[in-house]
Amino acid sequence: CGGNSAAGGPGFIPGLVRTIPPATVQQTHGLTSCSEWTGVSLSLLLDQAGVKPKGIWIIAEGEERGMHTKSIPIEKAMDDVLVVYGQNGEPIRPEQGYPLRLLVPGWEGINSVKWLRRIKVTHQPAMGMKEMTRYTRLLSNGKSHWFEFEMGPKSVITRPSGGQQLSGPGFYEIT
């Protein structure tokens, strides 16, 4: 998803009214995580397949319902993208995309396709439903800008968190 800190509050889901004040980091800064990933560089796989990095796209296809696909320019695919099989020292869990998922650092999470089943190399991006309708930016002139990718780094203080209060003056560990 591209909802950087979209914790499901008002405005994120039309008509949602929050009745309980947020108390945890995921409630106030949801859709954030920190993991150590294990995998293979996509550029290594593409090199071994004989792909020439010029003016083409890769299309990552996942086993999600609706056959989730994302188009990624070859320049990014050959940079720091990984095909991952491990998270935090263990195999990826099913809810995180087992057995394989794409990891696209610095880009919206929707590009890190879970349950990866196929990677295609093409001369044009896929025009799937999500790419055409959900992950576009409407410009002031009424036109749409497709293929929004980058998402800047983010830091969140997790401790103290939510409703926690410091007991008074002194030294505290902030994490």
Language model segments and positions:
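Structured, non-membrane catalytic/scaffold regions adjacent to prosthetic-group chemistry
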Residues: C1-T175
